[in-house]
Swiss-Prot record:
Cell wall formation. Catalyzes the transfer of a GlcNAc subunit on undecaprenyl-pyrophosphoryl-MurNAc-pentapeptide (lipid intermediate I) to form undecaprenyl-pyrophosphoryl-MurNAc-(pentapeptide)GlcNAc (lipid intermediate II). Coiled coil: none annotated. The gene is murG. Keywords: Cell cycle, Cell division, Cell inner membrane, Cell membrane, Cell shape, Cell wall biogenesis/degradation, Glycosyltransferase, Membrane, Peptidoglycan synthesis, Transferase. This is UDP-N-acetylglucosamine--N-acetylmuramyl-(pentapeptide) pyrophosphoryl-undecaprenol N-acetylglucosamine transferase. HAMAP family: MurG (MF_00033). Belongs to the glycosyltransferase 28 family. MurG subfamily.
Length: 379
């Protein structure tokens, strides 16, 4: 840490969920290694995700999510965003950052608006295949846009967009070194189920119901790790106990990358961070996009991996316990297919995304344009 602040300060702004904070954490790790003093601006939800940042480098900015059309609620929301703008200006006057990078979520609006109005270079990173609402609102103001799954060379902001991939945290890169080893037909079958950093109620009900429909000899092979919301944890655990299936059920796993590396098969939502980690580590998956995502971003993320042959995608509405049981039984008895899926997933992973994004961040901080960056990085 001795070289911190040799280069100056960069502030990362991210909404307080794992999907926004994990790529911010990955970029922070890379920038620190290059001598930057990295601070995080976020909201109050972020507490359990920010262990990678020193406490005095985490700044809670007042914010609110724009939802609905109630005039009173909208007035309160815009008042909170205005207060966040004042918070951000005060913070930036003290830190004097050379760059502010946004990772999506409404809590990024105040810091990015404040930075652009103060003449501080700005960059946003969009993790998904479809740009989220906060980033859409910022895209016209920022100096550069980095994309995880955004379509290349298309859209209104193609000229200032660079496809970097989604940065993954160091533990993911460590897990990626573990090769995929398929389970033999009589071996224990390690199943990992998770719904992103906030869990998934649907999985807590559907997976135990599907496991109950499996033949007894198939159930006896299962070892399950399942992330469940706190309110669903006890019922999911009890369901597996009743079935006699060993299951580790918890609201959050700090060692999720290692658990993914240990898995023979993954059933998950298809948020950008989830899909990116699956591809970097290289594991076969069934993806069930969250059906109520505002911009259908999860469906687009899942389609990108399915097109490469790295995952099966199933709509939640089509996934009855019976169908889920059939698909799980098929996965358990087709190790060669899962091995091919794992290879296909890994082939589209971008383990160097943090390095590429850090290169872009340093270029924008130094005053370069996106065009100059692209020309300097052509092979």
């Amino acid at each position: 840490m001795d070289n911190l602040a040799n280069q100056g300060v960069i502030v990362l702004a991210a909404g307080g969920t794992g999907g926004h904070l994990f790529p911010a954490e990955a970029l922070a790790h890379e920038l620190r290694a290059r001598g930057w003093d990295v601070h995080l601006a976020t909201d109050a939800r972020a507490q359990r995700f920010v262990g990678a940042f020193a406490q005095d480098h985490v700044h809670v900015i007042r914010s609110a999510t724009i939802a609905g059309r109630n005039p009173v609620a909208l007035l309160k929301t815009f008042w909170s965003l205005w207060q966040g703008n004042l918070d951000s200006r005060k913070l930036f006057r003290r830190l004097k950052p050379k760059l502010v990078v946004g990772f999506g979520g409404y809590p990024t609006l105040p810091p990015l608006y404040a930075a652009s109005n103060m003449g501080i270079p700005t960059l946003i990173h969009e993790q998904n295949a479809v740009m989220g609402r906060a980033n859409k609102g910022l895209a016209g103001r920022v100096k550069a846009i980095a994309g995880g799954f955004l379509p290349e060379n298309s859209g209104a902001y193609a000229a200032k967009t660079v496809i970097t991939g989604n940065p993954v945290r160091p533990p993911v890169l460590v897990a990626a070194a573990t090769p995929y080893t398929p389970a033999g037909k009589d071996d224990r079958f390690r199943l990992l189920v998770f719904g992103g950093s906030q869990g998934a109620q649907f999985f807590s009900q559907a997976i135990p119901a599907a496991v109950a429909l499996l033949p007894e000899h198939e159930r006896a092979r299962l070892l399950i790790t399942q992330q469940a919301r706190k309110e669903d944890e006890a019922s999911a655990r009890k369901a597996y106990e009743k079935l006699g299936v060993p299951a580790d059920v918890a609201p959050f796993f700090n060692d999720m990358p290692a658990r993914m590396a240990d898995a023979h098969f993954v059933i998950a939502r298809s948020g950008a961070s989830t899909v990116s980690e699956i591809t970097v580590i290289g594991r076969p998956a069934m993806l069930v996009p969250f059906p109520h995502a505002l911009d259908h971003d999860q469906a687009a993320n899942a389609a990108a991996l399915a097109a490469a042959g790295g995952a099966e995608v199933v709509r939640q509405a089509d996934l009855s316990p019976q169908r889920l049981a059939e698909m799980l039984q098929s996965a358990m008895n087709e190790p060669e297919r899962l091995e091919q899926q794992a290879k296909a997933a890994k082939s589209v992973g971008k383990p160097d995304a943090a390095r590429l994004l850090a290169d872009l961040a340093e270029a924008i901080a130094s005053g370069k344009t996106v065009q100059e960056f692209k020309e300097g990085n052509r092979p």
